[in-house]
């Protein structure tokens, strides 16, 4: 059985002003707390749980936790299974047993909840192989909407990446847990 999600904080104490800069460097930490029902945890807590062998497998989504702390980087080498969703190569993917390439924020639809609790919608700026830039045809450019595979402007490189939620849904389907969105 898996435990509840473990939400790490990325706080740099003292690096804050009264206008824009926050100590918490994670753009969607409030959204992660609201979705998971968990409070933010420090990397030290994760480090202790792995050392005590209370965590044998770790599933990391779109985060580079090995870069947070040198001690955490070392202890991740001893974990039995490390699975990572990542948008690019980093210290955590280097240690991972399984890596899933996931879409960047510029390749997917979604929302983020800022530190004030305001929901901010993100829309893709780059088309991937499986998804156009809009959920509906209303917001598509004429090039996107009317272009065919024979048009030169449609021949640009499209990457084969999926949003993390689709990767999780595909994994669950492989384990006979049927979910569809």
Model-derived features: positions:
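Non-catalytic alpha/beta scaffold blocks inside enzyme catalytic domains
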Residues: 1-181
């Amino acid at each position: 059985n898996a435990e509840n999600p473990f939400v790490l904080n990325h706080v740099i104490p003292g690096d804050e002003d009264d206008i824009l800069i926050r100590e918490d460097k994670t753009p969607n930490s409030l959204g992660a707390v609201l979705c998971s029902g968990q409070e933010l945890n420090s990397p030290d807590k994760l480090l202790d749980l792995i050392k005590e062998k209370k965590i044998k497998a770790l599933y990391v989504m779109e985060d580079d936790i090995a870069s947070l702390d040198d001690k955490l980087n070392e202890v991740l080498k001893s974990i039995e299974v490390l699975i990572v969703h990542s948008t690019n190569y980093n210290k955590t993917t280097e240690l991972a047993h399984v890596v899933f390439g996931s879409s960047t924020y510029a390749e997917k639809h979604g929302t983020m909840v800022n530190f004030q609790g305001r929901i901010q919608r993100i829309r893709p700026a780059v088309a991937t192989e499986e998804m156009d830039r809009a959920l509906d045809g209303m917001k598509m450019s004429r090039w996107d909407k009317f272009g065919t595979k024979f048009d030169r402007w449609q021949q640009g490189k499209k990457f084969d990446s999926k949003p993390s939620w689709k990767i999780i849904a595909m994994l669950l389907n492989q384990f006979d847990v049927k979910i569809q969105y």
